[in-house]
Amino acid sequence: MKILIPTAKEMNTDLPSIETTLLRSESQAVLDALALYSASQLESFYKVSAEKAAEECQNIQALKRQTAQHYPALKLFDGLMYRHIKRDKLTEVEQAYLENHVFITSALYGVVPALSPMAPHRLDFLMKLKVAGKTLKSHWKAAYDEAVKQEEVIFSLLSSEFETVFSKEIRAKMVTFKFMEDRGGQLKIHSTISKKARGAFLTALIENQVQTVGEARRLNFAGFVYREDLSQPQGLVFVKEV
């Protein structure tokens, strides 16, 4: 089984760097397309300040020159979901589960094990980058499918922008998760709740060595419990009373 999680915009490079490997051909093609942009073009491409665009330009050129520092992806990304994932002081069993089952979906690196080396970069599937005339989603679709086609169980903690990179056949196999708060009988869902809960849920999967949908249903984490009345066979809903 594989658990798929998205990348994040926020990154923390205050970490020990690690050795890297050569970029796969699909990644190199994306990098080559990005490297054609000047700092001022990146400003409008990323919709960021000139200062931020200059920083991103340096990151891209460092990757291109193979001088970029690399870090374990799960620790490099530092968005809200990531900050709620157990990333340190894992037992041997938890570490093995993480290495075998948790994969990050990236618009630059593809579908890779969570502790794979990644360099700081900014790219997601909403960005209108063309790679050899194709959209990012079209460019990656075959490789994304290939990464999970043998799996019987695929847990998706992805947003739709990442899920829709996969073919319909693969998406039909995915088990998805929704996290809601019950405020006096009113069910609420918003991105902050979802991001925190996804991190806490992944931590519960790791700590409990979950391998099946049935085991996932039995989890109780960060105040969230499974709600059968709101769920579908492949769409599990967890609710926290506040």
Swiss-Prot record:
Pfam families: H2O2_YaaD. One of its GO terms (biological process) is response to hydroperoxide. GO terms for cellular component: cytosol. It comes from the Bacteria. InterPro entries: YaaA. Belongs to the UPF0246 family. This is UPF0246 protein SPN23F15130. It comes from Streptococcus pneumoniae (strain ATCC 700669 / Spain 23F-1).
